[in-house]
Amino acid sequence: MSDFQWRFIDFALQYDVLRFGNFRTKAGRPSPYFFNAGLFNDGFALKQLGQFYAQAILASGIRFDALFGPAYKGIPLVSTIAIALAEAGHNHPFSFNRKEIKDHGEGGDIVGAPLAGRILIVDDVVSAGLSVGESITLIHAAGATPCGIMVALDRMEKGKSECSTLQEIKNKYDIPVISLITLDDIIAYLHTRQDLVHHIPAIETYRTFYGAKVPDTVNHTGRSTSV
């Protein structure tokens, strides 16, 4: 695990984005932990979040021309990532979609730069792949090419098959998926925290029931991959 991944977990705990206890996922599964990126909800948090994503994107080595954030959570996310990348010397155009198509003014369903070239989709946590499919459809319709997906957390849970949800997306659309951190990273972090280590058995039990059974080839930042 890279230093910035370690710091990101610290950061997520500080803002209660990552919590441990008894929760239920969107899929209806009881879960011993919860990750809600919507709680990065002040100026400092949003700036830091963009910097973490930018570091992860650059560390992955993925080649892209522009960024795209699916509405609604992807709108502030893609904006802060674009700023962080520019501050690091990598200036890229960005855009996002409207949920409701505008029929006046500039019109259309895309706000920001025109979709062109290789487009990197950025999101928080992909649970069902719905926003990903919609984003890919929009990108193709504009004549651009989706070249990858960047998310904050890979829960490493099986989706509709024995593969993880992110692996299913990778297989379906034949594009790389990058995660800032994984459940493995969270567990490794917990092993270093005496005040939190007691949560590990519940997480391991959860993985026994819901963890992906097929080896994952998703690009977890800091690990080598071909993109």
Curated annotation (Swiss-Prot):
Chain positions recorded as 5-phospho-alpha-D-ribose 1-diphosphate binding sites: 26, 72-73, 98-99, 102, 104, 123-131
E.C. number(s) listed in UniProt: 2.4.2.10
One matching Pfam family: Pribosyltran
Keyword annotations: Glycosyltransferase, Magnesium, Pyrimidine biosynthesis, Transferase
CDD domains linked: PRTases_typeI
Catalyzed reactions per annotation: orotidine 5'-phosphate + diphosphate = orotate + 5-phospho-alpha-D-ribose 1-diphosphate
Pathway where this protein functions: Pyrimidine metabolism; UMP biosynthesis via de novo pathway; UMP from orotate: step 1/2
GO CC annotation: cytoplasm
Required cofactor names: Mg(2+)
Keyword flag Manganese: no
Binding residues for orotate: F34, F35, S127, R155
GO process annotations (BP): 'de novo' pyrimidine nucleobase biosynthetic process; 'de novo' UMP biosynthetic process; pyrimidine ribonucleoside biosynthetic process
Domain of life where this protein originates: Bacteria
InterPro entries attached to this UniProt entry: OPRT (IPR023031), Or_phspho_trans_dom (IPR004467), PRibTrfase_dom (IPR000836), PRTase-like (IPR029057)
GO molecular function, one term: magnesium ion binding
Protein family: Belongs to the purine/pyrimidine phosphoribosyltransferase family. PyrE subfamily.
Entry-linked PANTHER family: OROTATE PHOSPHORIBOSYLTRANSFERASE 1-RELATED (PTHR46683:SF1)
Chain's role: Catalyzes the transfer of a ribosyl phosphate group from 5-phosphoribose 1-diphosphate to orotate, leading to the formation of orotidine monophosphate (OMP).
Alphabetical list of HAMAP family matching this protein: PyrE
Xref: NCBIfam families: pyrE
Oligomer and partners: Homodimer.
Name of this protein: Orotate phosphoribosyltransferase
Organism from which the protein derives: Nitrosomonas europaea (strain ATCC 19718 / CIP 103999 / KCTC 2705 / NBRC 14298)
Gene name as annotated: pyrE
